[in-house]
Regions:
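A domain-level signal for the structural core that forms small-molecule/cofactor-binding pockets
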Residues: 1-118
Length: 118
């Protein structure tokens, strides 16, 4: 049961554009982690610009007001290679959906299965 949290600045992403980003994240999870299509859990947050704070650039990446901050949480137990493949797949798909390769930052974490309920 992966959970994706998508954070954007209010007004920067219309319904169509956010749907593309959402679909890109889910497609990467299905492709890399082999989650079934019905295993779909996402929270989309829109923040006023004054509450969405970030550096203008970091490690060669240059951000605009279209920056997306992604937070992926999934059950532990997958290999390092699989986790790295997921990050690469999410990055590639979200960059294509959002329009700029620099405008997203991704954080992932793993949790014990016992900590999930559903």
């Amino acid at each position: 049961m992966p959970l994706a949290k998508i954070h954007v600045v209010e007004g920067r992403y219309d319904e169509n554009r956010i749907a593309k980003v959402s679909g890109a994240v889910q497609a990467a999870l299905m492709n890399t982690l082999r989650v079934p299509p019905e295993d779909f859990y996402q929270l989309i947050f829109e923040f006023p610009k004054k509450r969405f704070l970030h550096t203008p650039s970091f490690v060669g990446m240059h951000y605009t007001d279209d920056l997306i901050i992604l937070d992926l949480t999934f059950i532990e137990g997958r290999s390092k290679e699989t986790r790295l493949a997921l990050l690469k797949d999410v990055n590639t798909r979200v960059a294509a959906a959002a329009g700029r390769p620099d405008d997203h930052a991704l954080r992932s974490s793993r949790r014990e299965f016992l900590l999930w309920s559903g």
